[in-house]
């Protein structure tokens, strides 16, 4: 019975991911057709994007698609935690933003479309150097939107992460549209984002309850959302193990397609090892594998699923 339940849950997650793509095909196509909308002000852009749609979710999606394809990530300002140019008109004119700039513009456009939207400030981990290294200052922002009147009808949207990702040093930005940061999975979002105000942790008590708990978790990359990982083990970001003892990993997945490869990469961006292919099992959507590390060392460890880094750990191996 337990196996059947897991298969059913996996089916529902797969169906949900597929349904989302179909549901937002129209606003995505509309925003893509409009292009950059150069020389238009914020109000005109918001109206042009949302006018064809009556449903607030589709309006919000059109805004999300347009922003993630037409606003670039401001690396210098983000690295310096400089948020002086976050006003919506400045972001639209310069076509670049910090995470708070993305969130502020999204909130402004949503309000113009009569969608209730609030900006949430908080924390993310961008690399394994952040694990167990509690940040003193807020380093990220996202939004929550309300489509109904109940607490369960608030949804996460992260337009900055949806546009792409940076390297560890925040020197390079890779555009990489991630659909799944729109109405993001609340459980996974709570593992990868920590709000400054706990009232905006929408997944409830399943997520980390303190900053210390949050910074003790693994790093979850954009591909964790596209893969739909859940029930991750181990859920501690810093792993200690012996050379003679295998380390076991497992997670659920909600991807539509079958996973064909899993690999481990040791080392940071500057000195990564060659990917080490894993023998893994897929039992009703539960991916499991293990690896025995052969020498004493401490290093970042990346889990790569079908060629994309999904999550990262720090690992310490002793004899």
Segments (PLM) and residue ranges:
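Alpha-helical and coiled-coil interaction segments, frequently adjacent to or embedded
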Residues: 136, 155-157, 166-319
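Bacterial Sec-dependent N-terminal signal peptides
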Residues: 1-22
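Juxtamembrane/interface motifs at transmembrane-helix termini
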Residues: 6, 81-82, 298
């Amino acid at each position: 019975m337990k196996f059947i339940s897991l298969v059913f849950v996996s089916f529902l997650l797969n169906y949900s991911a597929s349904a989302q793509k179909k549901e937002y095909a129209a606003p995505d196509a509309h925003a893509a057709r409009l292009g950059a909308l150069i020389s238009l002000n914020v109000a005109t852009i918001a109206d042009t994007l949302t006018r064809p749609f009556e449903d607030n979710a589709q309006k919000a999606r059109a805004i999300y698609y347009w922003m993630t394809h037409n606003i670039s990530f401001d690396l210098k300002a983000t690295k310096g935690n400089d948020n002086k140019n976050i006003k919506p008109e400045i972001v639209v004119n310069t076509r670049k933003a910090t995470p708070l700039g993305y969130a502020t513009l999204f909130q402004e456009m949503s309000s113009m479309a009569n969608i209730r939207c609030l900006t949430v400030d908080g924390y993310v981990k961008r690399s394994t150097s952040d694990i167990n290294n509690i940040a003193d200052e807020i380093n990220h922002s996202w939004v929550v939107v309300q489509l109904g009147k109940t607490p369960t009808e608030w949804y996460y949207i992260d337009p900055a992460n949806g546009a792409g990702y940076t390297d560890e040093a925040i020197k390079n930005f890779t555009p990489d549209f991630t659909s799944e940061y729109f109405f993001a999975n609340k459980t996974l979002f709570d593992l990868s984002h920590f709000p400054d105000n706990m009232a905006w942790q929408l997944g409830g008590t399943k997520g980390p309850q303190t900053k210390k708990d949050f910074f003790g978790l693994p790093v979850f990359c954009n591909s964790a959302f596209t893969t739909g990982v859940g029930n991750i083990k181990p859920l501690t970001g810093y792993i200690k193990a012996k050379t003679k003892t295998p380390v076991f990993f497992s997670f659920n997945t909600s991807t539509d397609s079958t996973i064909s490869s899993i690999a481990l990469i040791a080392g940071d961006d500057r000195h990564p090892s060659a990917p080490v292919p894993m023998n893994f099992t897929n039992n009703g959507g539960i991916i499991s594998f293990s690896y025995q590390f052969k020498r004493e060392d401490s290093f970042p460890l990346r889990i790569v699923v079908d060629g994309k880094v999904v999550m990262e750990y720090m690992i310490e191996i002793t004899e």
